[in-house]
Each structure stands twice: as structure tokens, then as C-alpha cells.
Amino acid sequence: MATPNSGRAASVYSEVQSSRIEHVLPLPSVLNHPFKIVQGPPSSAAGNPDEIAKLFPNLFGQPSAMLVPDVADSLDSNQQLKIGLVLSGGQAPGGHNVISGIFDYLQDRAKGSILYGFRGGPAGIMKCNYVQLTADYIHPYRNQGGFDMICSGRDKIETPEQFKQAEETAGKLDLNGLVVIGGDDSNTNACLLAENFRSKNLKTRVIGCPKTIDGDLKCKEVPTSFGFDTACKIYSEMIGNVMIDARSTGKYYHFVRLMGRAASHITLECALQTHPNITIIGEEVAAKKLALKDVTDYIVDVICKRADLGYNYGVILIPEGLIDFIPEVQNLIAELNEILAHDVVDEGGLWKKKLTSQSLQLFEFLPVAIQEQLMLERDPHGNVQVAKIETEKMLIQMVETELEKRKQQGTYKAHFKGQSHFFGYEGRCGLPTNFDSTYCYALGYAAGALLHSGKTGLISSVGNLGAPVAEWTVGGTALTSLMDVERRHGKFKPVIKKAMVELEGAPFKKFASLREEWALKNRYVSPGPIQFMGPGSDAASHTLLLELGSVA
């Protein structure tokens, strides 16, 4: 066990950081008064319920739980709990407040309880590497960004040996409960742990908390994942700044790639906040079966129309996962992986004859720098490293080539200069917004209540988020109800399905209704930095409010 000295020195904090530490967070009113937990109807699964039932015989079908007011507390306040918690996966603003919420619940409702933080993600559970979290240890991290209180990791508890290590740690620390703070993969893992512990009759219960800036872990009961609000506001501030720069110089097109490996939620939200000239949404590209040339032509068409209006500048938003949405690119990558696994690339290019005609055509269409990247950048398994392809730079080069053609045809007479940006890591550890700070604190407090009542295999759920905080609802949703199965290595594996951008959903429909106007008229919005007081300080994301029907 580590010595409980906090890793942060609040003495060197900025005035804003110091004021955030002392910021008192409101709680949903149900958590401020005596409550009891009521159960909902039996649950099913997001897909293939029969297979999920086989994989989770002890948990499948369990009802969701809801906290409702009561005349007196139904839980034993004298029960001293031992709770462990772990941060899993990439950072997201607000994680420290989930921890603060769990700690404060135990202080308020189960005095004398102990809270352990496992260091470095799930590996900390397997190695029994932990720190006891005290009021003094937690204090400098309240309302602060980052995961550095205990740090995170991407290990998974998957093999029988690893499950045994987790069981040993739970037994050694005599844990009543474990909270897994993570995204879709981490919460799938949390459910497997809960099932394993229950099958062995261990007393350790497991509760998940929904974390990911990508915004792709959500459902009716879990309206948003924490961190999305803050990350989008950080990116939108920077996009707004770039827009004013574009307008000021009048000569650059800024191509901005935004984090989000699968879903395009961040790109869509930032578009709604800032009104760029062009926004590519991966899910729409996939639905329309667009080729890379179609995407390029769309961008070039807008640039030409803007040039006719005298605008030789603009801002273009691109989701990080765009490549994954274009089937022809996926086919090319699959063919390259196969060829390069068996052949040496000869300089004469004879290896290209092994590509299908469609893939060869696409390969020749790509800029030389991207061709080289596809050939040379391999992961340890020998596969093309798609994540390393700088899509924004690739598109700039392809747009340049197409505009040159149009110049020669006489249909484009202006000058084009592209500037590339990637906004990613900047958004993962910022000071959480008032929304994320409060939402995370409530998620943590709810996780404490669910464990105190003996629940397991649920994800902490805070709803009615369009209303004032006092009216937010609090409960837990069966993790198995979010699950489907995927076939991997001939076996069914449980997965929480990522929530993708819905083209029939309110956020996309609003964007689609405005994008033509944004393309040709400069409707730029500069949201400015995140506010903690005054105008806009308590505003939730456009995506959340549109999905909840709280705004038109």
C-alpha cells in the first residue's frame, strides 16, 4: 500500500484552481434527504438477449434501481463499508469528482467506512496496488481535471488467472464493493467482474460509472457520459479562436480533426457550438456509402462557391474516426495488411498488382505521403496503424490536387492555403465544467448508495439532466441491458454497444438544417473559455439538451 501523501500541492494552484477546490456542489434533492431504493421491471439486453443470458447467468434480467424519497433512511448508517475504486481507460474531466462523491457518501451515510483507490487502472486491482483515500488526500483534487489522483490504465481483467488475482485482492482488502469508472469496454469488464464475484459467492459488489469524452456510452437511462461536456467546450473555444483568425487573415482554410475514434459526437457538438463552414460526420459518410473522392469533392465544391463570394478562408471539422467509416478505405487497408504480411514491397511497384482494381485506384488517388504512411507505419501485429493517419493533412493534399485540376479547367481562380490542427489530448484533463463537476459528483454519490444497498452489476445513472440539479433523478441501470454480443475467435463476446450519431436524432437534424447556411455565410460563433460563474456557466451541451427535447 502506498503512503497516503497527495501527489498535488494546492499551494501552487492558480486562483481559479483554488476557487474550484472550495466550490460546493449541489446534489439532487433525493440524495439530500432520507431515501429508499425501489426496483424497476426485469431488464433484457440491447441485442441477442439469449446469448447475454448464457454469458451472465447470475446477473441477466435484473431490474434497474431508483432512489426515491422516504420518511427515514432504509440503509444502515452504522454499517462500515470497505470500497475500492478504479479509473479505467483514457482520461475525462470529472473523474476526481466521481471519487469525491463516493467518499462523501461514505462520510455522510456510512461513517467509519474505508475507501481504497487502485493505482494505474485495472492492473492496480490485479497487483493489489492501492492507496487509502482520506479527506486530506482527496482535497486538492476536488473539481480538478485529470486522473492523477490514482492514475488510470488500459489493462483488462480477462483471463482466469486475472480474475483470480482480482478475487484475491477483493478478499485481502475485505471489499464490500468496487466502483469501475470507465467507458464501454471498462463497464463490460465491470459486469464480467460482478458476474464472476457473484458466481463465487463473494461479497464484493461491482458498480460502473459512465466515462468517456467521446460521448458514445449512453442510453435512455444514462443520458450522457461524463467528460463530453467539458471536452467539447474546450475544443469549441479553440475552434472559435481559429474561426476569428481565419476571418482576420482572410487566406487560410483550417482543417480541424477532433478526437473520437468511433462515433462523431464531439465533431457534431462542436459544430453546433461554433457553426463551421464544413463538418464531416462519419456516420453520414457511412450511411451514404461515400468514397474518399466524394468527401473531397464536397469540400472542394464549398471552397469554390465561397471563392465566388470572395471568401478564400474557412473552417472544416473532421472526426478522428472518419477513415473507419469509408468502406473502400477499409477494403484497401485489409488488402494491404494481407499483402504486406507475405510480400516485400518492391520499389518497382509490382506488389500493387495484387490489389483489386478498386483498391489500386484508391491507392493511386491518395497523396504520396499517405501512401508511404500506409506502407511503413505498422503496429506490432503488422497491421496498418489507422489511428496514425493524419486525416486532416490527407484531405488538405487531396483538396489541393482537385483545386489545381479545377484551376486548369477554369472553374476556380482563387488561392487555397490549408492549415491542419488536431484537437485531442487538450480536452481530456481540463478543469471540469459546472455540469461535469456536478454530474460526476452525483454519479459517485449514487454509486456509494447502490453499493451500500448491496446492488451489483449496475451502472450509476443520473437522469432528468435538462432540469435544475435538485430535480435530477438517481439510480442504477443493469449493465447487461446495455449489452450485445460480437463474434470473436469463434466465440460470442459480450460488448456494450457504442452509441453512434443517429442521423434521425435531433442533434444531427438541427445541424443538417443549418449547414448550407453555415457553408456560405460566415455564422461563426466564438464560445470563449469555460465559465464557472455568470452567463453560460451552467449550460449543458447542445447534444444533451436536443436529445432530451429541452431545446428546439
Swiss-Prot record:
Q: Which GO terms describe its cellular component?
A: cytoplasm
Its domain of life reads: Eukaryota
| Residues where diphosphate binds | 90
Active site as annotated: 214
According to its UniProt entry, one GO biological process term is: fructose 6-phosphate metabolic process
EC numbers, comma separated: 2.7.1.90
Instruction: State its location(s).
Output: Cytoplasm
Question: Is the keyword Cell inner membrane assigned to this protein?
Answer: no
Keyword ATP-binding present in the record's keywords: the answer is no
Q: Which residues form a coiled coil?
A: none
Question: Where does the record place the site Important for catalytic activity?
Answer: 211
Q: Where is this site: Important for catalytic activity and substrate specificity?
A: 185
Q: So what family is this one in?
A: Belongs to the phosphofructokinase type A (PFKA) family. PPi-dependent PFK group II subfamily. Clade 'Long' sub-subfamily.
- The entry's protein name is Pyrophosphate--fructose 6-phosphate 1-phosphotransferase subunit beta
Classification from the root reads: Eukaryota, Viridiplantae, Streptophyta, Embryophyta, Tracheophyta
